[in-house]
Amino acid sequence: MKFNILNLLSITLVSFLMSCAGSEPTDVQVEDPAIEVEVEVAEAPIDDIFYQVPSPNDLFNVLKDADISYNKEILNDLSRVESLNSKKAKALNFGVYAADLAYVSSLGQIGDASPIFETIRSLSKELEIENAMNDVIYSRIQDNLDASNPDSLFSLSNETYYKAYAYLDNNDRGDVLGMIVVGGWVEGLNIILNCQDYNDSSEVVQRIADQRLTLENLLVFASRIQNEDLDNIIAELAPVEELYNGLVVTEDSDFTTDESEDGVVVFGGGSTVSFSEEDFNNLKSIVAEIRASIIDGTL
């Protein structure tokens, strides 16, 4: 089944939450971000509208402006790749390493980016998706590694991720695509949950809370791929879904719409999400457990 990355509906799903609170747990009230939707009237039935799947870079944009210290210990050990024996394990961990590359690039750690890039390149060959990233892409990435250009590398890591996405989409390999997306999302969420303690005013924490929307998006995407292995992987995300579904959401009656000059309709308002330190810590524990089963190849 085909999944068009740049189809009719593009949903901007960003905003997360986290940092350090005092002895009394507090709830952070987070407004759902505006949703920007490009509307093309009567072009296709609903079944042909596919949600855009986020790349790991979407999570880490906030780190570039936040006062976040780099923590290499968060990354997946590159030596683990040698023990990955199944297509499922390799695809999930391709996503994991793609998220790691986005993280180190976002914080300008060029020295750690190069070996991660080589690991991704190796996995792409084993998954038979090396054609998704031709020699021009590899050369551009290597040039930016050599020039210590983190901003361009961050952009290229995003491009590489979507090149793999498009290649798998166009070649009817939705199972591998779904696994890569899940692996990248779980690793990205684990990283951002561990980059600082809970703080009810942190923009990073805001990102974490808003991942409830990204998860909904991911589940819709995965549900369109008929594959038993992927279904089993998605089932492991049930505790994360349950936690997000348990958050208190207050609907905002002030809902607005506007249209930009280029025809993009922007929906404002929406709802407010309460995300406490307890929610944060529970999510951190759940995600760490899922991530552990991915990187050791047992999921």
Regions picked out by a protein language model, each given a short descriptive name:
Residues 81-88, 92, 107, 144-151, ...:
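Short, solvent-exposed segments of well-ordered alpha helices
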Residues 21-24:
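Bacterial signal peptide processing site
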Residues 30-143:
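N-terminal Sec/ER secretory leader and immediately downstream segment
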Residues 16-19:
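C-terminal motif of bacterial Sec signal peptides marking the signal peptidase cleavage site
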Residues 1-9:
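Bacterial N-terminal signal peptides that target proteins for export
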Residues 221-299:
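A cross-kingdom marker for long, charged
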Residues 150-237:
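Extended amphipathic alpha-helical interaction segments
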Residues 76-83, 95-103, 216-223, 264-274:
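Acidic/histidine-rich, surface-exposed loop or edge segments in extracytoplasmic proteins
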